[in-house]
């Protein structure tokens, strides 16, 4: 393998936005979608969404380009309790350019550590991002 693994830094304004997002008080679903600026080698904000379901979020993701998502999800437990887990979702669709995938894969752990997240999931097809999929993944934590 001739290419070395590139680990991109996280843009300072994005670090602050993630910190604020972590402590938000709103009770609806919300997402921060991030991408890599390959020229600057930085993880930057792509889009911020409020009141978005997993199915609506899926429609915002490019089908052929990787993205990082931090998603605040209103999780209704079977016993009636409600929690708001923060999920990190790495969307790495099949058919992405290999160098792009390597750059995202190499930067994922640094971003997860920066955002201090523990619920980390990956999808290889944007169509997989559904409410059912997310509830199943979160079921392991609750």
From Swiss-Prot:
Briefly state the modifications made to the protein after translation.
Phosphorylated; stimulated by phorbol ester.
- What's an example GO cellular component term for this entry? cortical actin cytoskeleton
Recorded hits in InterPro entries, A to Z, give: ADF-H, ADF-H/Gelsolin-like_dom_sf, GMF
Residues that the record marks as modified (N-acetylserine) are 2
- Cross-referenced SUPFAM superfamilies, in alphabetical order? Actin depolymerizing proteins
Q: Which PROSITE patterns match?
A: ADF_H
Q: Which SMART domains match?
A: ADF (SM00102)
Q: Which GO MF terms are attached to this record?
A: actin binding; Arp2/3 complex binding; growth factor activity
Q: Which GO terms describe its biological process?
A: actin filament debranching; learning; locomotory behavior; negative regulation of Arp2/3 complex-mediated actin nucleation
CDD domains, per the entry: ADF_GMF-beta_like
Which Pfam families does the entry mention?
Cofilin_ADF (PF00241)
| Protein origin, superkingdom | Eukaryota
Q: Which UniProt keywords apply?
A: Acetylation, Growth factor, Phosphoprotein
Tell me which residues make up the ADF-H domain: 4-139
> Which family does the record claim for this protein?
Belongs to the actin-binding proteins ADF family. GMF subfamily.
Q: Report the protein's function.
A: This protein causes differentiation of brain cells, stimulation of neural regeneration, and inhibition of proliferation of tumor cells.
What's the protein here called?
Glia maturation factor beta
Organism, scientific name: Rattus norvegicus
Q: Which gene encodes it?
A: Gmfb
């Amino acid at each position: 393998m001739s290419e070395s693994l590139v680990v991109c830094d996280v843009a300072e304004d994005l670090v602050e936005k993630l910190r604020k997002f972590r402590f938000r008080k709103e009770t609806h679903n919300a997402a921060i979608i991030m991408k890599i600026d390959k020229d600057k080698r930085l993880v930057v904000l792509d889009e911020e969404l409020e009141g978005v379901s997993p199915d609506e979020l899926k429609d915002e993701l490019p089908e052929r380009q990787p993205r990082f998502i931090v998603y605040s999800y209103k999780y209704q437990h079977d016993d009636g309790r409600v929690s708001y887990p923060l999920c990190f979702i790495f969307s790495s669709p099949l058919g992405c350019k290999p160098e792009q995938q390597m750059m995202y894969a190499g930067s994922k752990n640094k971003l997860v550590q920066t955002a201090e997240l523990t619920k980390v999931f990956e999808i290889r097809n944007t169509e997989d991002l559904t409410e059912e999929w997310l509830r199943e993944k979160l079921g392991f934590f609750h």
